[in-house]
Amino acid sequence: MSSADIITLPQILSRVPELVSNLPAMVKGSRMAKTTDTRKPLGLGVAIEHATSINPNGAAVLYQDTELTYKQFNAWANRIADYLASIGLKKGDTIAVNIENRPELLATVVGCAKLGICAALINTSQRGKVLIHSFNLVNPKAAIVGAELVDAIEEVRADLDLKDNFFYFADQDTLENPGDAPEGYKNLATEIKDCSSENPASTKQTFLKDPLFYIYTSGTTGLPKAVVFNHGRWEKAYGGFGFSAVRLGKNDRIYTTLPFYHATGMVVCWASAIANAGSLVIARKFSASGFWDDIRRYNCTAFGYVGELCRYLHEQPEKPNDQDNQIHTIVGNGLRPSIWKDFKQRFGIDRVVELYASSEGNVAFSNVFNFDNTVGFSPVSYAIVKYDKEREEPVRNSNGNMIKVKRGEAGLMLGEITDKTPFDGYTDPEKTEKSIFRDVFKKGDAWFNTGDMMRDIGFRHAQFVDRLGDTFRWKGENVSTTEVEQILDGFDGIQESVVYGVEIPNTNGRAGMAQVRMTCSHEEFDYQGLCAYLKQELPAYAIPVFLRINEQEMETTGTFKHQKNKLKDQKYDLAQQDNPVYVLLPGESCYQRLDEETQKGIDGGAYRF
């Protein structure tokens, strides 16, 4: 951290004039973010209907050659809601939704929201055992599947608890051409054709604690956890990000390539558009070479990001038209301090609304003051406490209380659990309780353990430092080390594995690395078979980039925990270990042994991970 990143009073005061001009919207957003009224109708469906009432003919969603007004989009969602109700689905039910980024996904989620049905947003990268787990975990009453993911579902369908009520959206503009559903599926686009386009009365029956959707996060016990994201949390994000932080108008267009099974795309970007009835522009996938062409084509004024996205854009060759765009605001998380200022200057960006939040957490930060190199400011009760990495626990004083860090110091981020900042928890009560620290500063208090190391930089601002424990972030995704270990240990030829994240220079997050003990010598091992197995069982971002071969028993602590800190420090550096190391280079289909020349290339940026 640079001392220049510490926030001072003069810096705060210098931002006041800009904030004053946006004060009404920020006050409104702040009130929404603190709502505790359990009797007031709110949430996604209510917000869409409000946006439709104030800007019915404005563009709500743009995708490829399709442009839907708020009136058209709302009517579509209403037909979906009407049909789902007609087949007996109701408030409190769950529907599994497995569709890639396109309007059909968004209309489905809103249709469910208007009925009080919870949409389980399946990670579209999941396959095999992980997909089975995520699906069965939430006990869905129906599934809505895009054509692009039917094969993934069919591979595991025999192991799914749901045996009927599978619905289908063709991979095309289904409002124009519904297509034909495969055997075993009903074509939802055809089924809803004659349903009511009017707002259902049930929209006004969604309240603070009603579930809106499940978002899956990496589980410390291995497989993903389904996090309940209720209408109240969505409302708070809608106010906190949409009105207070991002502050887009009805003529703004925010572009996102981020997957909608994550909260940054589904909640932050979309809520920022809905707040003042602006437009959401969707891309199916991220393309570094085509990104700015899309921005210009759709006249976008904002975009959503994760750190990897910005790095890829920054690594593109500079062009004379880099500033030929209308972007004034970007919103997301993980923009690296090393490129922050250069990125803004190169592309002519005024505001970086860096944020910090998690799908399950109760504490959030956003860069409302537009400082550099910070996740911003938080109005809610939080604490950054001293943390012992060796013992893997917070430090407590002689009275048994945790100790807050001083300004400039890093520690573990905790969010106080109160009526205004509840922790909604997971589907598993035991997992919920494990995420809570009690008696932190006084008897009876309760705080959510974010698992993140943060630095206090003053005036309620913080910097993200690192992710602790059994997950790490790579390619904009959270990776569960336990999940990857369980998959590795299931491969013939691997006796034991320990997985951790390691830093590669000039990349965001940490790449997966596994120390493995094999049943044969590393020269005889079937690396081709391992790669094929991992591609079948894991999303691409979770496949380890490096393998460290260990022919001895794994080193553990007295409580039989693997000693990962030493492994993380040594990472793939051949000078720090005698172990053979193998690497899966970008574009390659199999691991190869790492040598000094290849390591120098990796460290020097010759390979694009």
Regions found by a protein language model. Give the residues of each.
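Conserved C-terminal "lid"/linker of ANL adenylate-forming enzymes
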Residues: 498-504, 513-517, 531-609
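Conserved AMP-binding/adenylate-forming core of the ANL superfamily
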Residues: 36-41, 45, 49, 57-102, ...
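Conserved AMP-binding/adenylation subdomain of ANL enzymes
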Residues: 235-253, 261-301, 316
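AMP-binding/adenylate-forming catalytic core of the ANL superfamily
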Residues: 126-133, 143-146, 303, 357, ...
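Structural core segment of the AMP-binding/adenylate-forming
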Residues: 2-16, 86-87, 110, 114-191, ...
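Conserved pre-ATP/AMP-binding loop-to-beta segment of ANL
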Residues: 168-170, 190-216, 223, 246-253
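Conserved AMP-binding A3 loop
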Residues: 69-71, 212-236
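Gly/Ser/Thr-rich phosphate-binding loop
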Residues: 275, 297-305, 314-388, 422
